[in-house]
Amino acid sequence: MKENENQRIRLSKKMLKDSLVSLLNTKSIHKVSVIEICHAAQINRTTFYKYYGSQYDLLKDMEDDVLTHINDYLGGNIDYTGNNLERIIKIITFINNNLDLCRTLFDNNIDPDFPEKMFSMPSMKQLESEYGGSSSAYVFNFVTDGSFSIIRRWMNKENRETPEEIANIFNGIIMKLLPNATFI
């Protein structure tokens, strides 16, 4: 979220986002109308159009928020020579704290390009450069697709492991497959 947004704007946007997540649990983004979003959020359409041009713009804003948070946990103040586990725990905890939103965004029926957007972040693309040669793209796809599948499976379990437990599993798999990995 933008730092210059006041509390009222943030609340309106949150209500719109929560309403879209709720609606996407029952229908595709293509069948959700702005009127339905506004009705569910109890916000008029003028307010909606003040911030977004369509339901797709709202979805993109939601995706951008998640990608920004994940990218912040991957990079920023975290030392890349440090332990991968700390970064994984932060990402899994963020997903756990925003489970409904992440379940919705990680559902391939909503935006099939979301996994690609998530793993094309500069901090994730670092993996490709670390494993040069003709196999680097395959290694990157293997790790990213597998990571995405693990996260989706974990999110959809009824009795999920704690973020720390799944992060340990995740980190263990990565360290066995790529013992020199420092990309996350």
What role is predicted for each listed range?
Residues 75-101:
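Hydrophobic alpha-helical connector segments
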Residues 23-57:
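Helix-turn-helix
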Residues 22-29, 72-73, 98, 127-131, ...:
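Basic, amphipathic alpha-helical hairpins
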Residues 5, 12-15, 135:
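N-terminal positioning helix adjacent to the helix-turn-helix/winged-helix DNA-binding module
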Residues 108-148, 179:
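Amphipathic alpha-helical packing segments from all-alpha helical-bundle domains
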Residues 136-157, 161-177:
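Hydrophobic alpha-helical segments that form the core
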Residues 1-9, 180-184:
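N-terminal intrinsically disordered/low-complexity leader segments
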Residues 11-22, 26, 40, 57-76, ...:
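Alpha-helical structural segments
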